[in-house]
Amino acid sequence: MEKNFLNNKTINLTSVLNGASIIGCNNEHFGRAENIIAPGKGKNMGDGWETRRSRGKNFDWLIIKFGKPGLIKKLEIDTHHFKGNYPDSCSIQTANITKNLSNQSIIKNSKIWKYILNKSKLSAHKKHIFKKFLIKRSKENYLKINIFPDGGISRIRAFGNFVK
């Protein structure tokens, strides 16, 4: 991990291999949240994050803490294996939190984080790449994915660089 920081190599900031971790989510009915930051391609639906069906204007969310602060250049939302149970759309919010806060405080305050990806359509069994749609930000160390209204995601990848 330190090598990536020193040589400014583009890496997956949301990978468990680069120190990322899940700090919370509102639902993991069918698939564990930790699966979404695992390395490699999802083996099946059970190897992704999937929430229970909901109706109305509800949405599901998950928050990832990076191993170190980074600058996101490209997002990849992979719905591989999710054909009838993928989210209709998603949005991404980020924050750079420098205070030592509890996970509960971070989750509570995530409602006001800045958007780097406004609500965008998703489709079944596909790797969705978002580069030109990203709203430019400075360094971040937390990422929140909101899925509307529910569904499954195999992997999320935020490619960028660690920054000081």
Where in this protein do the model-derived segments appear?
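Trp- and acidic/polar-enriched beta-sheet ligand-binding modules for extracellular glycan
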Residues: 1-61, 71, 82-164
